[in-house]
Amino acid sequence: MKKPSSKIREEIARLQDQLKQAETREAERIGRIALKAGLGEIDIEESQLQAAFEEVAKRFRGGKGSATGKRQAGESRTGTEPSAALASGADEGGSGEA
């Protein structure tokens, strides 16, 4: 038996809420770590910081290559990447900057 569209919409809304909560937790975690490491005190452009986080992510994933801080065509921001989570957490938190 197929689900009615209203039930599917409810399930999608519930899953979107769960995703948002998970992204918020990830952003807060990475933001706390970044602040403990002193990144809140460094005056750096967001694109440079993004590139640095992408390099760190590649290092931990075992990948190679340099990061540019720019997304390639077709790439999307899913919230599962540390750099994406930090960017959203930094915008929301803001308490670590002087």
UniProtKB/Swiss-Prot annotation:
Q: Which Pfam families match?
A: TraC (PF07820)
By its UniProt entry, which NCBIfam families does this protein fall under?
Answer: CjTranTraC_Agrob (NF043004), PRK13848.1 (NF010422)
Keyword line: Conjugation, Plasmid
- Give me the ranges of the annotated region Disordered: 60-98
**Gene transcribed to yield this protein:** traC
Q: What is this protein called?
A: Conjugal transfer protein TraC
Matching entries from InterPro entries are given as: Conjugal_Transfer_TraC (IPR053443), TraC (IPR012930)
